């Protein structure tokens, strides 16, 4: 039992890193809507759509992360501008964060048809960082430890670039550009945000007339904790059913001497499916299962998402949106 408590505490510390830094919420269905990691993705689908997801991580472990997010995005100016609004709430143990971001993307046409675009995006919003002191070491509290909920609201910004055509895509983005500089020293127990960098790319490979293969990757780094790599692959059947998964692990991208040498990678695998019952609705589900110390202690991670697309008859989409 003691070993389990130490293990869970260590996992939380890797994600939370109290006082000095805060890790962004983790989720597995970012490949279904890139707006969650890149503001330049706004307008990519070239139609008004609403997307929401809920993630219950490490089911069965008390205080494990839970994340709820909703986004809406659309195009303007003949498709040359993308607009998006995103609202998120994330809870991990005693930590609770909420955020609202508005994103703007300028989408440069790279060919006459407009099927190839290079987008530059920026997002601005506010983040509420909170900590429930009642959940922190209640037996032997520290002198400055809050007795109840303590929070601070700070401004923030994010930026990114996203390229796509009908065969492949690539993107780079960074968040927490402003909030990292806001002084929250008066609230010593509130984790301070720090920038997260996202690099992603993927391609589309036809296997037959009705089956496509979509491999992709996501590299995430915060210049503090371990660098995370996701390797993804999906089979697409007739544009209606997506079946695939991911493998997530830590990689040594560059030397981080401040990390302990025997830090466990906390590898995990993801099985996911995405369904399109009709042209307006998309439903997704992902199940993450740990490969490592948490295996056997957690019942896995469940994540569900849903989207609704408002079709505009005035706009003719030249190619389906796979990215």
Model regions: which residues?
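Subset of outer-membrane beta-barrel
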Residues: 22-323
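Sec/Tat signal peptide C-region and signal peptidase I cleavage site
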Residues: 16-21
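Short, flexible coil/linker elements and helix-boundary hinge sites characteristic
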Residues: 13-14, 104
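Sec-dependent N-terminal signal peptides
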Residues: 4-13
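Positively charged n-region of N-terminal signal peptides that target proteins for export
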Residues: 1-4, 110-112
């Amino acid at each position: 039992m003691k070993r389990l408590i130490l293990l869970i505490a260590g996992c939380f510390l890797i994600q939370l890193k109290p006082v000095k830094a805060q890790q962004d919420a983790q989720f597995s269905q970012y490949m279904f809507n890139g707006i969650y990691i890149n503001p330049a993705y706004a307008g990519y689908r070239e139609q008004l759509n609403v997307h929401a997801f809920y993630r219950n991580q490490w089911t069965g472990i008390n205080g494990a992360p839970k994340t709820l997010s909703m986004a809406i995005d659309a195009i303007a100016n003949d498709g040359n501008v993308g607009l998006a609004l995103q609202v998120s709430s994330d809870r991990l143990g005693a930590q609770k964060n909420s955020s609202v971001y508005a994103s703007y993307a300028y989408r440069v046409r790279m060919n006459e048809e407009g099927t190839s675009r290079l987008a530059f995006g920026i997002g601005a919003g506010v983040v509420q960082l909170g900590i429930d002191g009642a959940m922190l070491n209640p037996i032997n509290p520290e002198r400055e430890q809050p007795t109840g909920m303590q929070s601070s609201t700070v401004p923030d910004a994010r930026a990114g670039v996203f390229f796509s055509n009908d065969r492949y895509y690539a993107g780079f983005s960074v968040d927490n550009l402003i909030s990292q500089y806001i002084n929250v020293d008066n609230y010593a127990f509130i984790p301070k945000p720090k920038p997260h960098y996202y690099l992603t790319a993927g391609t589309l490979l036809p296997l037959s007339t009705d089956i496509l293969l979509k491999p992709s990757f996501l590299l995430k780094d915060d210049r503090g904790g371990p660098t995370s790599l996701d390797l993804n692959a999906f089979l697409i059947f007739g544009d209606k059913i997506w079946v695939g998964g991911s493998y997530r692990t830590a990689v040594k991208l560059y030397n981080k001497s401040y990390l302990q040498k025997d830090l466990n990678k906390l590898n995990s695998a993801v099985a996911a499916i995405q369904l399109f019952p009709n042209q307006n609705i998309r439903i997704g589900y992902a199940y993450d299962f740990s490969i490592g110390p948490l295996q056997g202690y957690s019942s896995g991670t469940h994540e569900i998402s849903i989207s609704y697309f408002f079709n505009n008859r005035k706009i003719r989409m030249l190619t389906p949106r796979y990215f």
